[in-house]
Amino acid sequence: MRKSFYSWLMTQRNPKSNAPVAILADLVFDDTTFPKHTNDFELISRYLEDQASFSFNLGQFDEIWEDYLAHQYVDKKESYRLF
């Protein structure tokens, strides 16, 4: 089962980093209305565009999403190796 985007993003938190993923993770951490239990790109993208209490470059979000998907693929491959 795929980790929610929020769960994965929280593993990327690093207040000392200027990396876009770390910045987004810190912003989302402080946003109490962020959709935490989904991995639906459209829902999260619309939220960031229309409802988030902060602004973030959506082009960077697209890149972060691709990284999230890549990590999900790697995690899935690793779980198959356990069997």
From Swiss-Prot:
InterPro entries: UPF0346, YozE_SAM-like, YozE_SAM-like_sf
Coiled-coil stretches noted in the UniProt entry, renumbered to this chain: none
Family indicated by similarity: Belongs to the UPF0346 family.
NCBIfam families for the chain: PRK13672.1
Protein's UniProt name: UPF0346 protein M28_Spy0369
